[in-house]
Amino acid sequence: LRCLVGSEMCIRDSFDLTVGDMMNESILGRAQERDIIRIEAHQIRDYTLNKQKQVDDYPYGGGRGAVMQADPLYQCWKHICEEAGERVHTIYLSPAGRTFHQGDARRLKDSYQRLILVCGHYEGIDERFVEECVDEEISLGDFVLTGGEIPAMAVADAVCRLVPGVLSDPECYENESHWNGAL
């Protein structure tokens, strides 16, 4: 998912869900048509080398369940960074992350030209990828979802709508309940 004026946000997921489709509709879709923001979804399975396009495996070092493999995640991350010509600020959407607030949306919009949002699945993602590539972990709250796509879309929407020109009138968001900490 790519977002922001002259900048990029990428959502990376392992399932053929409608992340790209959902982000191409309504206000964000119109903003993309006007080249105000750019949103792009990357399919992690395209970066695996096995014939089955498998992206899950047992955790490195043991543990319960399956995690997303480090290599396909890393290959996708590397591809996006090479395309951008720089290391891109990377956020892993995780129930263990810091809770996301409106202030975070403003900080991300103001601080970064490009963002990568990594969607976990299964029991999460390989910790080696987190240690090597992830700059921060964000959660939507104290609950667990089946994957990171919904949180990634929420974060992307919250950040992108702050980009000048996305909303028709800046007062639309300046008068919202969370803009100045009213709630």
Model regions and ranges:
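S-adenosyl-L-methionine/SAH cofactor-binding core of RNA-modifying enzymes
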Residues: 69-121
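Hydrophobic/aromatic beta-strand patches that form the interior of the parallel beta-sheet core
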Residues: 12, 40-42, 89-91, 115-116, ...
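Short N-terminal binding/cap micro-motifs at the start of the first secondary-structure element
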Residues: 18-23
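A short aromatic-anchored loop/beta-hairpin motif
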Residues: 49-51, 56, 60-75
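Single conserved hydrophobic/aromatic residue that forms the stacking wall/gate
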Residues: 1-6, 10-11
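Long, charged alpha-helical interface segments
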Residues: 179-183
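A short beta-strand-loop structural module common to alpha/beta enzyme folds
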Residues: 34-48
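Structured adenosyl-cofactor binding patch, chiefly the S-adenosyl-L-methionine
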Residues: 125, 129-176
